[in-house]
């Protein structure tokens, strides 16, 4: 949600990291900076998800204090290399240098020397093309991990079969196979496999299958599901007394 206050409260609930979603969230840059401040003020690592690894977005958000980038729709090795180049200072990348950014001022004069080890970089693989190029993407030096977008991968399977409703086949089985492939590719390259879990039980299942960077639902889902449960319980309790 586009609210620094909500982000601050959410971040204070014991999370290791909180990700600000600029791919699907209706959040502008000014609001994003305030939300990053709120997350960091709660002692939590602030991460940002960006569309397609846009270099301008990436550089600006890192300068504003984001401690990690997860870039959507990374389909090729070239996409992954552009992402790393935007996130890493030389010699690992091409990130531009300024010692007067918020990030540099927060982390001290040695920020540019330490940022390459402090910043996390995840490439989202979530299409048929991305899975086809998984091995070459995962081998890009400077990536910390591959984040698998299971929902978009299923959509990609359906798009690939456009005009042939049966052509997508068993999308659930194909997605399960892709999840396994992501874990194997990450292990082969000594990087982390990541994915979102809808609930704690799903998070455990991902962990047991080899995922080590696991995000859990969202602030909007947490708020609405809890509110819905309270309303339902209250109505049921009152109805039982009538």
Describe the predicted segments one by one.
Residues 1-242:
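Expand to "…catalyze enediolate/carbanion chemistry for C-C bond making/breaking, isomerization
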């Amino acid at each position: 949600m586009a609210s620094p206050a909500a982000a601050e409260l959410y971040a204070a609930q014991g999370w290791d990291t909180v990700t600000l979603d600029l791919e699907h969230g209706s959040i502008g840059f000014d609001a994003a900076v305030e939300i990053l401040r709120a997350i960091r003020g709660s002692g939590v690592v602030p991460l940002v998800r960006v569309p397609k690894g846009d270099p301008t977005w990436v550089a600006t958000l890192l300068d504003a204090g984001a401690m990690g980038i997860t870039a959507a729709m990374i389909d090729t090795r070239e996409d992954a290399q552009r992402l790393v180049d935007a996130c890493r200072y030389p010699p690992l990348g091409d990130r531009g240098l300024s010692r007067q950014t918020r990030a540099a001022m927060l982390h001290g004069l040695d920020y540019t020397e330490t940022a390459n080890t402090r910043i996390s970089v995840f490439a989202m693989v979530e299409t048929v093309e991305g899975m086809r190029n998984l091995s070459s993407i995962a081998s890009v030096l400077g990536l910390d991990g591959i984040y698998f977008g299971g929902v978009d991968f299923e959509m990609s399977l359906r798009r690939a079969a456009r005009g042939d409703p049966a052509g997508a086949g068993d999308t659930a089985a194909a997605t399960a196979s892709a999840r396994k492939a992501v874990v194997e590719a990450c292990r082969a390259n000594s990087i982390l496999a990541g994915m979102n879990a809808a609930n704690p039980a799903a998070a455990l299942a991902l962990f047991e299958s080899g995922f080590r960077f696991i995000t859990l639902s969202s602030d909007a889902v947490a708020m609405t599901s809890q509110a819905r449960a309270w309303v339902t319980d209250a109505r049921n309790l009152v109805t039982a007394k009538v």
